[in-house]
Amino acid sequence: MTGSIRSSTAGIDVRQLGSVDYQTAWQMQRDLADARVAGGPDTLLLLQHPAVYTAGRRTEPHERPGPVFAGAAGDEAIDVVDTDRGGKITWHGPGQLVGYPIIRLAQPLDVVNYVRRLEESLIKVSLDLGLETRRVEGRSGVWIPAGSGRPERKIAAIGVRVSRATTLHGFALNCDCDLAAFTAIVPCGISDAGVTSLSAELGRTVGVEEVRGAVADAVCNALDGALPVRDHPGARVASST
């Protein structure tokens, strides 16, 4: 999987945003996709969301959470938003870096290739922090393997939609988010695995600000083929010695 997957040779317009409401960001994606189809640039949005659950098209009724509350006083209800992306239900919130590439794919379309490139970019960022991660066959996203009595743990989720050869939605990398938010759901419909974060695995705080520049570079390089997709058969926390 080398060479660019994009139809354009122009650079990607990377927009580093702050905290953006999910519905606002979703409309932003649709507007950017319309603009891209009309000849505008490829764009990568990097941001955080206030706490929200998003349900992909394959979410079953029993997988939706009951009332969940957040906020300092625990009295702010967390919304559940139905989306048009693939996959099932997940959580977004503070401490999680969300990326939305709005990219016109080259022909012939290869959505699996596109997803593998997103995974590769997040595997690269994790490795540069000292954490080896990998793919799991049959499951999208980036994972820590089972070991020491712990199940496989997802550190980054991916859910995309491609319409008019243009991508929407994207990925979510858990940096220093509240992992308890995932306990109200079966994340992505996978009941035999866990969820983790960079901070939890590395034993130190790894905030969104620390990784957002590296994620932007890695995603752009992966989409353009400068970061090739590789096999990652094993994964562990790299030794500091």
UniProtKB/Swiss-Prot annotation:
- Site residues by UniProt (Lowers pKa of active site Cys): 154
Got any disulfides in this one, which pairs?
none
SUPFAM superfamilies, from UniProt? Class II aaRS and biotin synthetases
Which pathway does UniProt place it in? Protein modification; protein lipoylation via endogenous pathway; protein N(6)-(lipoyl)lysine from octanoyl-[acyl-carrier-protein]: step 1/2
| Key word Transferase present | yes
Cell compartment(s), UniProt? Cytoplasm
- Can you supply a Gene Ontology BP term from the record? protein modification process
Keywords attached to this Swiss-Prot or TrEMBL record, sorted alphabetically, are: Acyltransferase, Cytoplasm, Transferase
Binding positions for substrate per the UniProt entry: 85-92, 157-159, 170-172
Among InterPro entries, the record links this protein to: aa-tRNA-synth_II/BPL/LPL, BPL_LPL_catalytic, Octanoyltransferase, Octanoyltransferase_CS
PROSITE patterns with a match to the protein in the record: BPL_LPL_CATALYTIC, LIPB
Q: Which GO terms describe its molecular function?
A: lipoyl(octanoyl) transferase activity
Keyword Acyltransferase on this protein? yes
Question: Which Pfam family is one of those matched by this entry?
Answer: LplA-B_cat
Query: Catalyses which reaction?
Result: octanoyl-[ACP] + L-lysyl-[protein] = N(6)-octanoyl-L-lysyl-[protein] + holo-[ACP] + H(+)
State the remark under miscellaneous: In the reaction, the free carboxyl group of octanoic acid is attached via an amide linkage to the epsilon-amino group of a specific lysine residue of lipoyl domains of lipoate-dependent enzymes.
Family membership noted in the UniProt record: Belongs to the LipB family.
UniProt name for this protein: Octanoyltransferase
User: Which species does this protein come from?
Assistant: Mycobacterium ulcerans (strain Agy99)
